[in-house]
Each structure stands twice: as structure tokens, then as C-alpha cells.
Amino acid sequence: MAIKQFNLAEGQRAERKLLITVAEWKETQTTTPQGGGDPVTEEVTVREILGTRTEDSSIEYNPDIETTTDIRGFNYTDLNKTQPQQGFDPYLILGGSKLGAFLNDIRKRNAVSELNQFTMYIITAYIGTEGAYEAEKHVQCTITYDSLGGDTRVNFPITVYFSNNVTTGTVDKLSDDFVFTADVNVQP
């Protein structure tokens, strides 16, 4: 895959809103057909763009580094892996937040095994063009809720743990109803 250039003018700084994190998960929904009949249960994909009301959030890569010094006094550094994560604090309880309601349901049931079922997208809208923004798709990620409370508003801070099981590609738009297209001929 060729290195893509930033779609910014010379010296222009990328705005933070151009780095977008999206959570995706499956939910079971039951609906009753119009006009009656038996209820229909189906699994649907749900997405939410993270960061509403969060003032600062960064992906931290947490490198696992091993440094050794040989008998000649030279230092060698080995990077074993990265363990990327991203915190969202505050992550306020907001009306209409699909992820907040989903996580709160998991919290109430103490169903912690359900916290590792997320697909996460990192969209870098400062790379690519309209209709083909660069993106990474991470499968089997974990989202944890860190606390519940606050002073004047109910805060429910969360942390996203990316799996490093990544597929690169593009998304066609910067909303939660995007279509992800995987890159072809990319070796993992």
C-alpha cells in the first residue's frame, strides 16, 4: 500500500475533529410487524461516534519495550508490541446515546463478558478524499466503563482497548452510517 499524503495545505494543522473513533456492536431487537403477526427477532448492527462532550481524547499506544545493554555498553531496544487504548472522560449519560444505554445495561446485569464484543473504527479524515477517507477497522475490541457519578451531571467514563486485529481501508462518509471498504492486496 502506498503512503498516502495528508489532504491538508502546506503547514496546515489537522483539526482534532478529523480523527474519529466509532464503536460498532450487535444488538438483538424484537419488532412486531405492522398489521399484527408474530414478533420478529433479529440481530442488528449499531454504531456510535465517540467523543460527544469529551474535550480531550487521544489514542495511547502503550508500547511494550525491552531495553538491554550488551557487554560493550551499547543499548538495544526491542519493541515487542503496542497495546493501544483511548479514554473518553467525560463520557456523559446523554439522551439518545445508543452506546451509553448499551453499556449501562451491561453494567446493571454485571455481564462483563459482553464488553469485549466491539468493532472499532479509527477514521483519519485528514487522509484521503471525500468519499474515501482512510480508516482502520479493529475487531474484537473491549470497552470498559470506569466509574459512574459526577458532580452536576452523570459521568460514565469509558476506555476503549483496541485489539490490534486491524484491517485497513476507507469509509465513504464521516457519519455513523458509513460503508467501510477494505484495502485489497494488503499483507497483515
Residue ranges and their predicted role:
Residues 5-9, 71-137, 171-173:
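Extracellular/virion structural assembly segments
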Residues 1-56:
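Polar/acidic, low-complexity leader/linker segments enriched in S/T/G and N/D
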Residues 35-39, 129-133, 152:
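Short, solvent-exposed loop/turn segments that connect beta-strands within catalytic domains
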Residues 34-35, 69-73, 175, 188:
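Surface-exposed ligand/attachment interfaces on beta-rich extracellular proteins
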Residues 26-30, 41-45, 60, 87, ...:
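Ser/Thr- (and often Asn-) enriched beta-sheet segments in non-cytosolic proteins
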Residues 57-74:
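An ectodomain-focused feature that recognizes extracytoplasmic/extracellular
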Residues 45, 51, 67, 82-84, ...:
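Mature, Sec-exported extracytoplasmic domains of Gram-positive
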Residues 138-188:
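Mixed-charge, glycine-accented linear interaction segment located at domain edges/termini
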